[in-house]
Regions:
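A local structural motif
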Residues: 45-48, 135-151, 164, 182-188
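Beta->alpha turn/N-cap motifs
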Residues: 170-178
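Extracytoplasmic/periplasmic substrate-recognition and gating elements
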Residues: 42-44, 181-204
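Hinge/lid segment of periplasmic solute-binding proteins
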Residues: 1-31, 75-78, 97
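Extracytoplasmic "Venus flytrap"/periplasmic binding protein-like
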Residues: 1-10, 15-17, 39-45, 52, ...
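Short glycine- and hydrophobic/aromatic-rich loop-to-beta-strand nucleating segment
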Residues: 32-36
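Glycine-centered hinge/linker elements that transmit conformational signals in sensory
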Residues: 61-62, 113-149, 194
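Short helix-initiation/N-cap motifs at beta->coil->alpha
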Residues: 52-58, 146-161
Length: 204
């Protein structure tokens, strides 16, 4: 066998192994969650590094929204208008990433999902809660249809990177774009796990 396989994290090769033979090699790992501006959360008195569950995140986002709405952070963050931006126009964000959080819990592995003849969509209700959570903390909370026009560049380069929003559902791949806009801000980004309420919480 291949010598490198003994150095791989347990379980990582399950989906590319059949009849004891490994047919694939991992070459990159990406993480996604709520990428957030540490300075904004700290200024609001919120330790985002401790946020894991749906309820904790909802409460913290609610506290931050209240401070934004009252103008308490305006002096330090003049462009800040909302907790989140939700790029609904990007189907890979809503369909692939957000959807996978719910669908991934239905199967023990990618292989099992591939071979399955049915999809029960057991966690549809929790997925709706997750989507509603994100909508609730955008500037379009009262007009969700407007989110259909929000794309990647509006949420990252024109959102998080300029301090217009405090967080966005994205992954570690946004760092170079944020760095191009604001190096200091890019170096102060963190990631909060995206929770599937009562099912999978605290995972990136």
């Amino acid at each position: 066998g291949e010598g490198w396989t003994k150095h791989v994290v347990e379980g990582l090769l399950d989906d590319v192994t059949q009849d004891g033979k490994v047919y694939g090699m991992p070459y990159a790992i990406e993480g996604y969650g709520f990428v957030y501006n540490k300075d904004i959360f700290e200024a609001a008195g919120i330790d985002a590094s401790k946020l894991k569950t749906y309820d904790e995140i909802d409460k913290a986002f609610g506290e931050l929204k209240s401070k934004i709405d009252k103008g308490e952070l305006k002096d330090k963050f003049p462009a800040l208008e909302a907790v989140l931006e939700f790029p609904v126009k990007e189907k890979w964000v809503t369909g692939l990433h957000t959807g996978n959080i719910a669908l991934g819990q239905e199967f023990d592995s990618n292989k099992q999902a591939y071979e399955s003849k049915t999809l029960d969509f057991k966690y549809a209700s929790q997925l709706k809660d997750l989507i509603d959570l994100q909508v609730k903390y955008t500037k379009h909370a009262n007009n969700p249809a407007a989110l259909n026009a929000v794309d990647y560049s509006m949420s990252v380069g024109g959102g998080l990177a300029i301090g217009r929003v405090a967080a966005v559902q994205q992954g570690n791949w946004i760092y170079p774009e944020v760095k191009e806009v604001d190096q200091k801000l890019a170096d102060r980004l963190g990631m909060i796990p995206i929770p599937l309420k009562g099912v999978s919480e605290g995972n990136i």
